[in-house]
């Protein structure tokens, strides 16, 4: 896909020249006419396709994600709206910036949603899988930026819930930006996520135990897993299923004591944990002898079984391992908590369309119909 000749994708003008329609390998890709060729497909997922293209008004290259048939499934539509609203609210160097929600040519008659964000070069998943050399300084700098972005997210009263290497985007200067907020939740909410959940390998023990009152600490666990994967170039806990995942965790950090199980209110979950084989705690120093002790100390504090005892993002930024990079004056917080109120109402397809259309119009006040 990456090597496709640029000349292949010539647009057709539509809607009186206000829009350009590209055919990307049989996929219809229709955007406002400020997005001029050359256009390049750079990725695809279950939702649709992503292309890089230049906005000729701002002279900035952007990544445009097409979410095809965005309203076929209520949950997916809500996820799209949540992502748009969150990205518009969160303004931070380590969070991907939203540039546009492209207004549809005909206000009520649209099924696809196009979201433009900053264009990045790659993601952490690709870097980990590549044979590119990564010094410990690189890993440390990536960890610092993840925590810096997460401090801002958590201060907005938001839990990301789906941190994993492929959701951490990078450019050639090693700048890191967190993306994919479709699963984010308010940090005060206590009902168990009913839909998708964090990719299993990065999932905190309390989520594996179906704890209903999880907190921002679940993101910290994910960061610990990601950092060790960066250093080791392979996943720390690559579980095949829920039970295998928990076994891998306890084999490393030890079977939790009754004291460590204190946060679990569900008696069945406690019983389940008590019946697991008894594993002693292994020291990270014995498993990763080449990693400096300060790094391992921080990771052990992140990978603490009990979320109430797990280190917070602010505490992690203040840890001696990050002393070289830490600067509290340059680690901003979000001054206004994000409101998830729009999720409280049951919305039908037309209402959901209207809300996403409203977001597009707010970002394109000069559009005329």
From Swiss-Prot:
Assembly behavior: Interacts with MKK1. Interacts with CPK18.
Function: Involved in disease resistance and abiotic stress tolerance signaling pathways. Acts as a positive regulator of drought, salt and cold tolerance. Negatively modulates pathogenesis-related (PR) gene expression and broad-spectrum disease resistance. Functions downstream of CPK18 in a signaling pathway that represses defense gene expression and negatively regulates resistance to rice blast fungus. Phosphorylated by CPK18 at Thr-14 and Thr-32 and activated independently of MAP kinase kinase (MKK) phosphorylation.
Protein name, entry field: Mitogen-activated protein kinase 5
Residues annotated as binding ATP: 42-50, 65
Source organism (scientific name): Oryza sativa subsp. japonica
Residues the record lists as Phosphothreonine modifications: 14, 32, 194
Modification note: Dually phosphorylated at Thr-194 and Tyr-196, which activates the enzyme. Autophosphorylated. Phosphorylated by CPK18 at Thr-14 and Thr-32, which activates the enzyme.
Domain Protein kinase intervals: 36-322
SMART domains in alphabetical order: S_TKc (SM00220)
Gene from which the chain derives: MPK5
Tissue: Expressed in roots, stems and panicles, and at lower levels in leaves.
Active site: 162 (proton acceptor)
Localization terms from the record: Nucleus; Cytoplasm
Modification Phosphotyrosine occurs at: 196
Family: Belongs to the protein kinase superfamily. CMGC Ser/Thr protein kinase family. MAP kinase subfamily.
Enzyme class: transferase
EC number: 2.7.11.24
Domain of life: Eukaryota
Catalyzed chemical reaction(s): L-seryl-[protein] + ATP = O-phospho-L-seryl-[protein] + ADP + H(+); L-threonyl-[protein] + ATP = O-phospho-L-threonyl-[protein] + ADP + H(+)
Major localization listed first in the record, in broad terms: nucleus
Activity control note: Activated by threonine and tyrosine phosphorylation. Activated in response to low temperature (12 degrees Celsius) treatment. Activated by phosphorylation at Thr-14 and Thr-32 by CPK18.
Cellular component aspect of the GO annotation: cytoplasm; nucleus
């Amino acid at each position: 896909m990456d090597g496709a000749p640029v000349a292949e994708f010539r647009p057709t003008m539509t809607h009186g020249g206000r829009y350009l329609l590209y055919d990307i390998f049989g996929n219809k890709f229709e955007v406002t006419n400020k997005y001029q060729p050359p256009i390049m497909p750079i990725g695809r997922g279950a939702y649709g396709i992503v292309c890089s293209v230049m906005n000729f008004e701002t002279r900035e290259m952007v990544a445009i994600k097409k979410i095809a048939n965005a309203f076929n499934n209520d949950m997916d539509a809500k996820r799209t709206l949540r992502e748009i609203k969150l990205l518009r609210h969160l303004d931070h160097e380590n969070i991907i910036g939203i540039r546009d929600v492209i207004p549809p040519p005909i206000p009520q008659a649209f099924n696809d949603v196009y979201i433009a964000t900053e264009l990045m070069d790659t993601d952490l998943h690709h870097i980990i899988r590549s044979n590119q050399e990564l010094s410990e300084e690189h890993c440390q700098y990536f960890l610092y930026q993840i925590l810096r972005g997460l401090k801002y997210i958590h201060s907005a009263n938001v839990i990301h819930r789906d941190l994993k290497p492929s959701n951490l985007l990078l450019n050639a200067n090693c700048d890191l930006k967190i993306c994919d907020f479709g699963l984010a939740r308010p940090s005060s909410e206590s009902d168990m996520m009913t839909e998708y959940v964090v990719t299993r390998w990065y999932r905190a023990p309390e989520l594996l135990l179906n704890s209903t009152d999880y907190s921002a600490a679940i993101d910290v666990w994910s960061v610990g897993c990601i950092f060790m994967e960066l250093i080791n170039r392979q996943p720390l806990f690559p579980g095949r299923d829920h039970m295998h995942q928990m076994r891998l965790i306890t084999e490393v950090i030890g079977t939790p004591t009754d004291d460590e199980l204190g946060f679990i209110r569900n008696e069945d979950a406690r019983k389940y944990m008590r019946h697991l084989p008894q594993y002693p705690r292994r020291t990270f120093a014995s498993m990763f002898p080449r990693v400096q002790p300060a790094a391992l100390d921080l990771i052990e504090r992140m990978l603490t079984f009990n979320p109430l005892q797990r280190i917070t993002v602010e505490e992690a930024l203040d840890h001696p391992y990050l002393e070289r990079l830490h600067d509290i004056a340059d680690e901003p917080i979000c001054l206004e908590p994000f409101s998830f109120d729009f999720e409280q109402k049951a919305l039908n397809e037309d209402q959901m369309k209207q809300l996403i259309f409203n977001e597009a119009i707010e970002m394109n006040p000069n559009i005329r119909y």
